[in-house]
A protein has these predicted regions:
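Active-site anion-handling motifs in enzyme catalytic cores
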Residues: 1-395
Length: 395
């Protein structure tokens, strides 16, 4: 268990990085990237992360200093209460921040019901603390109260950067000034500034890693999405008859505490296989932190994933990857030529087959060439530094 920091450490400006959802290793990777980004702009900054699940998995990112989530610090409606030690000074810690950064990810989507965070963002603005929305996916919102809250926070934000093109239009429609909305890309790409290099002592990459989920697919019933995941696993096994397949996810191991737990989907998919097929499948159990996910994916010759961040981790290390996701967030890869391996119609058997065939062939493009192909996305991700540098913290 990780104890939270007691308050602001030495340094200036005071930057509070909010909204990290550490149950998802993709969000944990973003937290690492944002921490580095802030310190690259303000080398003497005091940085605290008001993140979720730090008490459970914060040890996976020991270089980050955590405090309770910002909605708990501010005591907004719907938030879990902050620990007793914070009851009297959570708001003061936020008030003493010179900048609050809402770190990128995909939580600003109506189906996630992020109401406490929306209340917290408005309260940050009302306290007079500059608020930066950094590297977000922003969806459409229909609920009148949510729209009103977003109009207040986005309209008053010191900066708004989004990671995909549809989010630009959504942010503007929700009140952000068009001239202030910057299209960037996923912040986790900043963790891979250099091309992959082969380590002489490292074993050759082998086997295929598969990430299954029913949370990032096209609309439909949970049963339909679970069947699609099982079908995808079977299709991979058919194509790699003499290789082992490893199942893991960047969102697993915490059960209901993490809201989404792909371990359940993976387990159900395995039960649909024949006994012979099951013997070829290895399952990674428990929570997988960002570094463990990055290292595990790098050991495989190919990756097939229904989640975005495993694809970004693998591609950034030169691992041929099929990304089968129907969501706005895949726009982080706009301008990157992945061919059929970027499959935005995962329910289409032909499109799915083309994606698998593209990356499971022995001569699939990989290594430095694949890393270089990500240059457009990495370049957009780097714009987030300019976004931060253009903010004048309230010091």
């Amino acid at each position: 268990m990780r104890a939270p920091s007691a308050g602001w450490p030495a340094g200036s400006p005071h930057v509070l990085v909010a909204d990290g959802w550490l149950a998802n290793a993709g969000d944990a990777a973003i937290a690492l990237a944002v921490d580095g980004l802030v310190r690259s702009v303000w080398p003497d900054a005091a940085v605290l992360h008001a993140a979720y699940h730090a008490e459970l998995v914060g040890d996976e990112v020991p270089e980050l200093d955590f405090v309770p989530p910002i909605d708990a610090l501010l005591g907004v409606d719907g938030a879990d209460p902050a620990p007793d030690a914070w009851a009297s000074h959570g708001e003061r810690l936020v008030r003493d921040a010179d900048l609050v950064v809402s770190q990128g990810g995909g939580f600003l989507l109506e189906h996630y019901a992020p109401w406490p965070r929306l209340f917290a963002h408005v309260q940050v603005v009302d306290l007079g603390v500059p608020l930066a929305i950094l590297g977000q996916t922003i969806g459409t919102f229909r609920a009148a109260r949510a729209r009103a809250l977003l109009r207040r926070s986005l309209g008053a934000a010191a900066a708004v950067s989004v990671r995909d093109a549809p989010s630009v239009a959504h942010a503007v429609e929700l009140g952000a000034g068009r001239s202030r909305v910057v299209q960037t890309s996923d912040l986790s790409l900043l963790l891979f500034p250099d091309p992959p290099t082969a380590q002489p002592e490292a074993p050759a990459r082998s086997g295929v890693a598969v990430v299954l989920t029913c949370h990032e697919q096209a609309p439909g019933s949970d049963a339909d999405r679970a069947r699609l995941s099982a079908r995808l696993l079977a299709e991979v096994l058919e194509r790699v008859a003499d290789e082992r397949v490893t199942l893991l996810s960047t969102a697993q191991g915490l059960g209901a505490r993490g809201v989404e737990d792909d371990g359940e989907i993976a387990g159900a998919a395995v039960t649909t296989l024949t006994p012979a097929e099951q013997q070829r499948v290895d399952t990674v159990d428990g929570y997988v932190g960002p570094r463990a996910a990055i290292e595990t994916l790098a050991r495989h010759r190919a990756v097939v994933t229904q989640r975005l961040h495993p694809a970004l981790f693998a591609l950034s290390q030169g691992v041929p990857t099929a990304l089968l996701v129907d969501a706005d967030k895949v726009g982080v890869l706009d301008g990157v030529d992945l061919g059929p391996a970027r499959c935005t119609r995962p329910t289409d058997s032909g499109a799915r087959a083309a994606a698998l065939d593209a990356v499971l062939t022995p001569n699939a493009r990989g290594g430095v060439e694949l890393w270089e192909s990500l240059a457009p996305a990495r370049g957009r991700a780097a714009r987030n530094r300019d976004v931060l540098a253009g903010i004048r913290p309230a010091m």
